[in-house]
Amino acid sequence: MDVAEYAAHDATGLAELIREGQVSACEV
């Protein structure tokens, strides 16, 4: 995950991406 992707999501959105397996917690 790059900075632009990170900035495009709030905490809830990031948690959803992790839950769906699109990114790992380490990436975030």
Curated annotation (Swiss-Prot):
<comment type="subunit">
    <text>Homodimer.</text>
</comment>
<dbReference type="GO" id="GO:0047680">
    <property type="term" value="F:aryl-acylamidase activity"/>
</dbReference>
<protein>
    <recommendedName>
        <fullName>Aryl acylamidase</fullName>
        <ecNumber>3.5.1.13</ecNumber>
    </recommendedName>
</protein>
<keyword id="KW-0378">Hydrolase</keyword>
